[in-house]
Amino acid sequence: MSSRLVDARVRGSRLTLKRMIVGGITALAVTIGSVGVAVAHGENGATDATAARGGHAQREPVVGRAIFDRTFRHGLVHTDGGKVHYVKGGSGPALVLLHGWPETWWGWHLVMPELAKTHTVIAFDLPGLGYSAIPRDGYDQKTTAARLHQAVNRLGYREVKVMGHDMGVLVGYAWARDYPREVTRLAVLDSPLLGFGLEDAYPLSFHFKLNMAPSPVPEKIVDNSDVATYLNYVFEFAAVPDAIDRDSHIRAYLHPARRSAGYNYYRAWPENAEDTKAHAESKRLTEPVLAMGAEFVFGLGVAASFEQVAEDVRGVVAPGAGHWIQEETPEFLIDCANLFFGPEGVPAPTESLSSCVA
């Protein structure tokens, strides 16, 4: 609802939306530029700093009991794009977590145990990434959403709540739009939609255009020895860079086929933009949408974007966060998600959480 957007009042105003997005990212980019991106290579392409973090995700199995939290289990489920890897734990209504690039399900590991106290948490590796099979095609938001719809149905769920970050925002939107009876609530973290604001960020970092370039351009430019350099540049868009488990994320993209799969999600962006614009009015979201932007990146631009495709949008800014909210400010995300996905009528303990209330 527009009344819950903290008076952003930007519906239909692309100029205002662009200023919100560019202003937030430019402020962060200036900070990045002032310090530079220093990368000292360690073993397997990890930096010395990230190597000290241990690469914990690499110890996790493909199937079986999780190591990071023994109440979770890893599994694989069949879809028409191949097997999809997931990590599942907790009890209660199903809450699906969708990661972005360059991450895997591990990007959610700091918030999963708390969310699992009230929900059955299912964190997927997007098709082609992490431990999921690599599809030959179908990296657009609509096809990926259909595959995850198949996955949760085969796991026995007919209703789910969905929370997506970055690339997971695009997939979560298409899932909620195309399967409105299945997705009862949607939370989206720090990405506007293509066709409604995300393209305004293209000039602010070269990685958007590089990742979208046709094969084999990025594949030839970034080889295994370059992965740490490249991804450490990307992770400098964090406001709290030391909070990011860079080593785990870097190692997940050391395999060339995984990198190509990640690029394929970007190569689908023009198709995603057309898909979103084509259905913005005819298939507006009616389920509640929590649109959370990072203070130092997209801010209320996420809510402004979703207001153009959804009826009930609650705009929230994650204080002190850069792009990776779930790793940089996990406590705030947990508190907000528990309110939004929890029972109706529970009051917010602070003003910053007021728009998170169910």
Set out the residue ranges of the language-model regions:
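Secretory targeting and sorting signals
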Residues: 4-40
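Gly/Ala-rich phosphate-binding loop of Rossmann-like dinucleotide-binding domains
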Residues: 113-116
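Sequence contexts marking disulfide-bonded cysteines in secreted/extracellular proteins
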Residues: 355-357
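Flexible "cap/lid" subdomain of the alpha/beta-hydrolase fold that forms the substrate-access gate
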Residues: 52-87, 91-94, 118, 122, ...
